[in-house]
Each structure stands twice: as C-alpha cells, then as structure tokens.
C-alpha cells in the first residue's frame, strides 16, 4: 500500500459525486491560490448535523493557527462568531444534512464559496447521524420523545422555531456540488493542516497514509 494518498477534486452535483477529476466549470486544482502579494484568502466554516469534532480538530493544529491566519481571513465561522456569510474563497463544511436549516445553510455556502470542502465523515457520507436512516422518521421521533425509557412529559416537539427534520440524513454532496472531500471522524489536526496549506499554495494535495488510516 502506498504511504501517500492524493486527494483530487470531486465531480458532479448529485449523490454520484466521487473524488476523481475536476468538474466542468469548477476551479482547477490550485486555482484558489493567488500568485504574488494579494489580500488574504477568505475562509468560512460551518457545522451542520455533527458533533463539532472537526472544528475541534481544526483547533488541534495548535500554534500553527498563527501561521494560518497569516494566509487567510476567517469569515462566517463558529471560530469567529460572524453570522453573515460574504463572498469567500474556501468553505469548510462539517456535518451531514439532517434538517431544513442545514439545507439552507449549505446552499448559502455553495453560493458564496469558490471552493467547497466536505470536512469529516458526516459531511462525506452522513456519518453517525445517518444511522437513523435505517428507521422511519416517525419511529425515531416516537422513540426519542414519547416511548423511550425515562421520558417525562412525552410529546414530539412542535415549535415553529425548530427546523423540520428531513426523512433521511444526507452527505452534503447529495445536496450541492462539492470540490474536495477530507475524510475522518474527525480528520486529525495534522491532516487538516496538510490539506489547507497545500490547497492554499496551489499544490497537489497528498496526505501521508498515517494521517488518514484508522486501523
């Protein structure tokens, strides 16, 4: 087995997306990089249906984040607490798509970000939240709020402020076009650092096997 795993851009805009060739109309590998002295690249991040572990891994790059902020400016992100998303060069999306709000946020990121990355297992394939896909949504709600052990004041929440759940949890490439996939539950801080620095530098992204294996 090779000790280096290359990540190439994805194709398509449906559930058939796979890491392979550059999609028509999308940036070529390295197109995000800007030669010469230019303004910092803008990066946005968000967490959909997940555990926030991928953002914790982003913070696990430790003191290297000081080097990262020399290269990029963070726009909307839980890290910055900026709520409104402006035009960005790079969007990192953690988590699967489980409710109507997730769909809205994800589509907003796709509209505003030149390059969109599925960050972590939940964004790539649905992850742990997608385990409910084996059951009907009604059965999940009943078990959680009505018939489960230790339930007090049973009843399925029906507040209009609560986003409506989708019947299934989807990986993000089933909703929007994705340019890169970075797997892991979560991907390590080292993997995120390698991915970001090579992408921002316009280099082919090659991650050592030690940064991606989970055996």
What are the residue ranges of the model-derived segments?
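Iron-sulfur-associated redox domains of electron-transfer enzymes in respiratory
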Residues: 2-15, 22-215
